[in-house]
Amino acid sequence: MREIASPSCFTDDASTFDTLARPSGSSSDKDLQRAEGSCRIVLGSSERGTRVMDVYQKSPIRVLFPRTSGSRVEEAVLVNTSGGVAGGDRLQTDVMAMEDASIAVTTQAAEKVYRALKESAHVLTTLKARDTARLAWLPQETIVFNRARLTRETRIEITSGSELLALEWLMLGRTAHGEKLSAGTVTDHWRIVKDGRLVWADSFRITDEVVPHFCRKALLSDCTAIATMVYFGSELEARLELVRDLAPSLACHCAVTLVGGLVVARFAARTSYDLRTALRNVLQQFGNGLAHGPFQVPRMWSC
């Protein structure tokens, strides 16, 4: 059996990374052992509340259901047991909420995308909210290391009567370690389909050539922490005005609009701390006025 390097091999020293993670003679991520993990979660409802109808998991992804309110299922937590994502890895997550299910899906910790040789890491997330289900996709941040390569896609399917809140956020470089991106590739796609019709498509891309120009105001204006949040439900106007009212008080740039029957908000901050603080503030206020549901700060964010 081929031995898998532990996460401790991914140190701050790039030369150490190459020595430990790359076998002699390999010049591509294809020559290395890579992860192909996936999970599927299907949720419905019963007299007791949300029920788990089906769960599938393939290493290195694990799915946990911490019980925080007696026997009720309110939160699903995804764990990447490999400790991070490397070039050539492929990870897929599928979540479907049906009937009157109410669930928040988050991650145990921030996801780390390590430096790659040539191949991109591929991360695909598919979210489906049907009937009168309420689904919140609230993972913790994704930290993109210097010279990492990431292709990520978020596909969402919603139907009239359902309610959904989805968030994805990126940290470009390990700013807490003083690291800044000098090169790297990030491709981030969103596709949202409502009642079988595409209502919103968005693509964000960073290449090696773009990284040196982050300081430009037309690009990121030196912001290294960015996020996109999307809401669909019956309280569109109220949620839109709430975020607009909060925006001036946040420790980051924030813009929000109503498009395609969705509330779409963008956030950009100079530090991960500022962005996390802003998102916590928005989520704490966002659920106010809505029926009891998953649209709050996940408990795992405080662990």
Task: Tell me the role of every PLM-derived stretch.
Residues 2-141, 146, 153:
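N-terminal, charged/glycine-rich beta-strand/loop interface patches
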Residues 2-6, 28-38, 42-58, 130-137, ...:
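N-terminal intrinsically disordered, cationic/polar leader segments
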Residues 41, 93-95, 127, 156, ...:
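Preference for bulky hydrophobic residues occupying beta-strand positions
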Residues 62-65, 114-120, 147-149, 175-179, ...:
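A short, polar/proline- and glycine-enriched secondary-structure boundary/capping micro-motif
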Residues 7, 170-303:
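A structural signal for small-residue-enriched, beta-sheet-centric alpha/beta enzyme cores
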Residues 97-99, 107-109, 129-131, 139-141, ...:
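Short, structured patches in soluble enzyme cores that scaffold and shape functional sites
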